[in-house]
């Protein structure tokens, strides 16, 4: 028996599928690339693309007052937790607050590893040492750092009154970006938060770079600097091994101008750890500022 399918039915079905796909895409775009705060676009000559930033101002923001600045990677990820933690910290401090700027990854282009992986490691991250055959593109964290230093920071300084307290925060690949900036442009920030960083890239190359920096650049810390490290106790064994190596590097290379803290959150997996770490990092940084002359 022949089955007859109405052409209008097929057309309507196709339109329904397309409409549903567009709704899903729009929802994903909104969740990823639109924030609950102030969204601004910057035409970056360094990156040769337009980048968006999310700006969270303090609830009692006063344009005549100066504020500390926090820059975080990964845009909306964990942003609600940051808002909650900053609000709670401000209540404890009697109103002192910071401006938080989150940089989302691009939506239609895969930019996360490109921007956050250091230039001495492969974009397609690997546990083994890289081969010098020129076939595997490096990360471009150096360009992303340039964007922050020569485009984003001047833009923010032109719009807001900022003091000298600056924090850079990142999670996972973003944590490795934090460590990259820490050992290549130390003076750019006086606070660094690296949640579950990935120093295992290319046979622990991030650990090696940090170790070499600490051993050979004793004078690099021209100002008191704070570093917060954390990892989840139930993360991948390779992550925990690399984290332990990183801890040992800091333990054996003391510097009077560097205060670093490390927390291992029991029973926490990779995506749990940053949620548990934000308040601790902010509290540690504030204690550091209180002790700094």
Where on the chain are the PLM-derived regions?
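Non-catalytic cap/lid and distal C-terminal segments of serine-dependent acyl enzymes
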Residues: 26-293
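N-terminal secretory signal peptides that target proteins for export/translocation
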Residues: 1-6
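N-terminal cationic leader/targeting segments used for protein routing and processing
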Residues: 7-9, 13, 292
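Hydrophobic membrane-insertion alpha-helices, especially the h-region
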Residues: 12-26
């Amino acid at each position: 028996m022949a089955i007859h399918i109405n052409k209008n039915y097929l057309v309507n079905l196709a339109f329904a599928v397309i409409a549903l796909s567009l709704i899903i895409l729009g929802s994903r775009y909104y969740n990823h690339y639109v924030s609950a705060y102030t969204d601004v676009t910057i035409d970056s000559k360094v990156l040769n693309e337009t980048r968006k930033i999310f700006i969270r101002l303090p609830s009692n923001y006063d344009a005549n007052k100066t504020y500390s600045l926090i820059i975080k990677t990964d845009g909306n990820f964990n942003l609600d937790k940051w808002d909650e933690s900053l609000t709670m910290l401000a209540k404890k401090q009697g109103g002192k607050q910071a401006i938080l700027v989150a940089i989302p990854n691009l939506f239609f282009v895969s930019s996360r590893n490109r921007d956050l992986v250091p230039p001495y490691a492969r974009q397609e991250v690997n546990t083994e040492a890289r081969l010098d055959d020129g076939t595997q593109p490096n990360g471009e964290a150096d360009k992303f750092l340039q964007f922050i230093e020569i485009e984003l920071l001047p833009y923010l300084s032109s719009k807001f009154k900022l003091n000298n307290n600056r924090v850079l925060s990142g999670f996972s690949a973003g944590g490795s970006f934090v460590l990259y900036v820490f050992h290549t442009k130390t003076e750019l920030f006086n606070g660094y938060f690296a949640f579950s960083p990935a120093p295992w890239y290319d046979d622990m190359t991030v650990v090696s770079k940090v170790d070499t920096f600490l051993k050979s650049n004793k004078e690099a810390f021209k100002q008191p600097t704070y570093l917060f490290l954390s990892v989840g106790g139930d993360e991948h064994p390779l992550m925990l091994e690399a984290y332990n190596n990183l801890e040992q590097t800091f333990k054996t290379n003391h510097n009077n101008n560097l205060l670093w803290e490390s927390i291992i959150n029991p029973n926490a997996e990779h995506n749990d750890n940053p949620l548990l770490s934000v308040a601790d990092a902010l509290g540690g940084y504030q204690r550091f500022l209180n002790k700094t002359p």
